[in-house]
Amino acid sequence: MAIRSRTASMWHGLVLLTACLTLANCSHDIHEKRADTVKDHVEAFYDHLTHDRVAAAVRENEAIEHLSSQLGDIISRRVNRPGTNQVDREWTDLRTANETAAQNWLALGQYLSIKKQYAQSRATYQRVIDTYTGTTERTYREQAARAIRDLDILTPPPSSH
């Protein structure tokens, strides 16, 4: 009877361990899935630009921003929970999505400038300045501000006679 109880206890422990490892692996998988999703959107973004489909590229980047927004919601719901590295992983995913979207907007601004669509380029850079206001996003704002100043060189204001 003691052997049977010990065997059952061992099996229960093994099942519990397997369940824990599976859940840990699922947690890791969700982060990989998010990274793959961002990567897919980035590839589609650049493919659309390559084929001069600006509106489609914008939608791809908006999808990355939407993922970032969802992650922000997840983090804000979990912020009061002590404990796991889950929030840290969520923050990493959030930062990755934000930085990727900001870089894509900057690339779109450059693309539009090359295509001599200066007003759209300027608006794209202004979007970076207006949207990415966090302290960790300062670099992107500064790049966008410099790009706007560079656009002023390419398209000076009309002179008044």
Model-predicted regions and their roles:
Residues L23-A44:
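Bacterial Sec signal peptide processing site at the extreme N-terminus
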